[in-house]
């Protein structure tokens, strides 16, 4: 689609951040929060079929944020064309935010599906932050003290999961609730630091980092 290609080309010297993830993990809700827009957020498959791009400013730093269609295990053939522009957006992104529904019982399998899709797109080496969403909906069943059976994933607390993933990902993951707006400011700080770092690398002579921006611009 030539028009979309031209639009992408004309976005200037701004770092591009793409929200990626399995379908129905809360990407559009997070997009609404970060971009203060009303992206169609609905609890069903493929609520976002087109790619939505917004200019976002955190502190003095503008960048482009795109909300992409959710990945699934087996993409229906008739939907492949609809995914073309969203996949181009992922390929052209400088930073990926991999949004995960941590309250879903199969969230680890969903992570693997997304990682495989990114690998198929040749995007495995892109800078990435895992955003574990829906912490407000996470539930687990504590084991009784005298229960000697092996612990299952149903017995793992949110704190234990956080410790495991933060040890694995170091500073490249964060736990939030977009719906409850929990930990969003820390996510913004993390995004600001990564985007600023990428911007200095990619556009070392662009001085807008030292200007003051407002949300209205």
Short names for language-model regions:
Residues 1-36, 105, 109, 116-217:
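C-terminal-of-GTPase-core extension/linker across diverse P-loop GTPases
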Residues 1-91:
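Conserved G1/Walker A P-loop phosphate-binding module
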Residues 62, 93-96, 128-129:
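The start of beta-strands in P-loop NTPase/AAA+ ATPase cores
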Residues 65, 99, 131:
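Generic enzyme active-site microenvironment
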Residues 66, 92-96, 166-171:
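Short acidic (Asp/Glu) and glycine-rich catalytic loops that position anionic groups and cofactors
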Residues 68-69, 75, 102-103, 134-135:
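Conserved Walker B
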Residues 79, 109-110:
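Residues at alpha-helix caps and immediate loop-helix transition turns in enzyme cores, especially N-
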Residues 79-104, 116-123:
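Inter-motif core of Ras-like GTPase G domains
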């Amino acid at each position: 689609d030539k028009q979309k290609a031209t639009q992408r080309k004309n976005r200037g010297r701004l770092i591009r951040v793409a929200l990626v993830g399995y379908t129905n993990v809360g990407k559009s809700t997070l997009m609404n929060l970060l971009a203060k827009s009303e992206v169609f957020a609905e609890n069903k498959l493929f609520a976002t079929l087109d790619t939505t791009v917004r200019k976002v400013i955190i502190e003095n730093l503008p960048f482009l944020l795109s909300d992409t269609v959710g990945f699934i295990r087996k993409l229906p053939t008739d939907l492949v064309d609809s995914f073309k522009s969203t996949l181009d957006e992922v390929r052209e992104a400088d930073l990926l935010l991999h949004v995960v529904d941590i309250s879903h019982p199969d969230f680890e399998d969903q992570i693997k599906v997304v990682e495989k899709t990114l690998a198929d797109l040749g995007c495995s080496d892109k800078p990435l932050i895992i955003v574990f969403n829906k912490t407000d909906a996470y539930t687990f069943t504590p084991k009784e003290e005298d229960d000697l059976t092996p612990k299952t994933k149903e017995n793992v607390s949110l704190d234990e999961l956080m410790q495991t993933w933060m040890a694995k990902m170091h500073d490249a993951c964060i736990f939030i609730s977009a719906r409850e707006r929990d930990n969003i400011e820390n996510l913004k700080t993390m995004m600001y630091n990564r985007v600023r770092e990428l911007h200095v690398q990619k556009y070392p002579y662009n001085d807008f980092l030292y200007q003051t921006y407002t949300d209205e611009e």
